[in-house]
Amino acid sequence: MSLFKARDWWSTVLGEKEEFDQGCLCLADVDNSGNGHDKIIVGSFMGYLRIFSPHSVKAGGGPQAEDLLLEVHLRDPVLQVEVGKFVSGTEMLHLAVLHSRKLCVYSVSGTLGNVEHGNQYQIKLMYEHHLQRTACNMTYGPFGGVKGRDLICIQSLDGMLMVFEQESYAFGRFLPGFLLPGPLAYSPRTDSFITVSSCRQVESYKYQVLAFATDADKKQEMEQQKLGSGKRLVVDWTLNIGEQALDICIFPLNQSASSVFVLGERNFFCLKDNGQIRFMKKLGYNPSCFLPYCSVSEGTINTLIGNHNHMLHIYQDVTLKWATQLPHVPVAVRVGCFHDLKGVIVTLSDDGHLQCSYLGTDPSLFQAPKVESRELNYDELDVELKELQKIIKDVKLQGVWPLTEQEDDLKVSASVSSTLDSVSQATNVEPGADSVPSITVKITLQNRVVLQKVKLSIYVQPPLQLTCDQFTFDFTVPDMTSSVAFSVYLKRNYTPSELEGNAVVSYSRPTDRNPDGIPRVVQCKFRLPLKLICLPGQPSKTASHKLTIDTNKSPVSLLGLFPDFANPSDDDQVNVMGFRLLGGARVTLLASRTSQRYRIQSEQFEDLWLITNELILRLQEHFEKQGTKDFSCSFSGCVPLQEYFELIDHHFELRINGKKLEELLSERAVQFRAIQRRLLTRFRDKTPAPLQHLDTLLDGTYKQVIALADAIEENQDRLLQSFSGLKSATHLLILLIRLWQRLSADQTAILEAAFLPLQEDTQELGWEETVDAAIAYLLKTCLSKSSKEQALNLSSQLNIPKDTSRLKKHITLLCDRLAKGGRLCVSTDAAAPQAMVVPGGCTPIPESDLEERSLDDSTELFTNHKHLMTEPPMPEVSARQGVLE
């Protein structure tokens, strides 16, 4: 806000509920009085044309009636008014009024009055042009270097420039690549038209090029210019300013140079005649209008810029010289001379506030009213203060919105069918030996109040597929209940990383102050059964990957834990069970009779995750039903980092292959386009010439492009499958670390946030660099051992790494720090060095040795610790025996 406001010299309000824009204001000696005094010409969208000759307003008075010289209703909306030499045979000034479908040129004349009411003014129509296209704006000037007269150029809404040589129509040209009209100005020194296109670039067109270009009475003829006579319309120069322009002004510096001023949405540009930037000013506000004018200082330019904050800024080049406050938002600003008072600033608002003002030091003072003094009752103030503090404390505990109120607005519940669909809803699945089942999920929504824009979105982990994942609801009255049902099935022949789905409901709750509603989100999770992606199978005697989970309770019959996978013919096999995933992998689960342990084994490491997680969940549910509260699971084996690193390397290799294929495809595409251009040149040549096997080269390149595109698509499919397996292995690794170190729920959440940051894996932002940055941050903060490690600078950019050695080293170091008693936390004191407490019976690992070890030996570190000693070998059992000794 400026300290000084514009000093009001004369002001008035035009009409009632009329609208105005930047082209509706013009200052000139329109009646050719010869005294050098300007008149204010204002046109409105309601069709009114007014001409004012303002006089100084006495203190306490308002504008006089004689200030309004003329007011006439033209019936059609007035888009723009200009004054120039528009009539042939005379150099007198005339008024041009642009309507949407008509251009009218008037002469304004005054008759001296014989009475005290003043002079009488009238306008006379000299000529008019009916336009075939809807006009947008216009400009005028001595086009082509003519002397003593001005020509008019009108820009239509569809991009046609129509040139009128006073009483006659000259020609029309369409601007190339036109989309939306922009501001238009004429530069007399270069004899060119300057505009800003929809491509957000300033474009200059020579008048001579426009005049000699092919005539364009129809827009379709622009495509036929190559076949007809005449020249193509080409641009003289362009400059990309990166934003839309509000207005353009041409200001002559001297006889040999002029400047092009462009007012953008956020910047103010001054350009040379050839399109080079003379200077640019970044604006910290939203401008509404501007006007360059001659500066008192030699070689500088002053510019008035109005904005939507009721301010008018005066710049000398790029330096702010003055800021003044206006009573309205100006949409047009001019500088004129009235009755020997030069430099009067005339502003017009969009609702018709017309003001003539000048700059001065008239401060806008505000005097606060006196406050009635009264005696204070400190006892009552103490009681009120305690009540307010209690309210603030309650709000802090509940959050910005009370949780109970959020839950009461909309209740969302999900129920999964206990049985598979009798008729599978699976469609477009990959061919396989097994029939793909589906299961129905029902989502129920119940609202308490009226809600708007209610949208339900469901998400499941790929390759699980939904028959429908988007639903909309109309809760126009309170206490409505709506339900939707959909089916879930496995679309691809590999295993998902999770069986948990998420239903998210977004809605808006209208209030008295906000009828559009306050946006809110409610979500509900549901768990799909294991039998959706798994079938009963034969137990396997041997497997490449094995895990053993310890418990503190007696072993439970697997037939009781997994009744939906029990085989009636094998009732005696209560301690062994086989699973066959729909992707083809087999998993075997064994229970020991005496050692309170369970073993899970499979040929693929990532396939162990779902069965292991399902086993722990069903064991917890089993003992909860029995009322046992102290049940717990643990893991005392080796952390399988080597198997995990193999999956990381496979996923990273697919990412590198995808990047190489994309680069190769880009090269082949460039080659393909180059061959096309060569062929096109040969075909256009009037003299036939041999193709020199360009057609064969084009066909071969096309086949290479198609083959590379197919290879990229195949690699993306393999990458999706690899990422799903990597997420499964990551879930399993987090589970084993949690059981191994007995991590709390908060610590497990930190691990999940570090290892599983992405739902989707892309070339721009991949899993490896994201996880590496997260683990490096944990090692630097809560798991750091010294201040030296805290001083390490982490990379601010996430780029695809050259290899996975750094990531694997960080994961190994993370497990080692946890083994030494490191604590995961993200509080403010997390950066403090943690005291590494080594558990009893554990041999510490020297940090220097850890850093120097090779990658091949890094995963064997944990086998040297006593708390990670290899479990005693379990005797192999047959699938029929199923008993662990």
From Swiss-Prot:
Signal peptide: none annotated. Keywords: Cell membrane, Cell projection, Cilium, Cilium biogenesis/degradation, Cytoplasm, Cytoskeleton, Membrane, Protein transport, Transport. GO terms for cellular component: BBSome; centriolar satellite; ciliary basal body; ciliary membrane; ciliary transition zone; cilium; cytosol; membrane. The keyword Transport applies. Residues 684-764 are annotated as: Interaction with LZTL1. Its main location: membrane. The record marks 141 as: Critical for protein stability. It is found in: Cell projection, Cilium membrane; Cytoplasm; Cytoplasm, Cytoskeleton, Microtubule organizing center, Centrosome, Centriolar satellite. It holds the Pfam family PHTB1_N. The BBSome complex is thought to function as a coat complex required for sorting of specific membrane proteins to the primary cilia. The BBSome complex is required for ciliogenesis but is dispensable for centriolar satellite function. This ciliogenic function is mediated in part by the Rab8 GDP/GTP exchange factor, which localizes to the basal body and contacts the BBSome. Rab8(GTP) enters the primary cilium and promotes extension of the ciliary membrane. This is Protein PTHB1. The lineage of its organism: Eukaryota, Metazoa, Chordata, Craniata, Vertebrata.
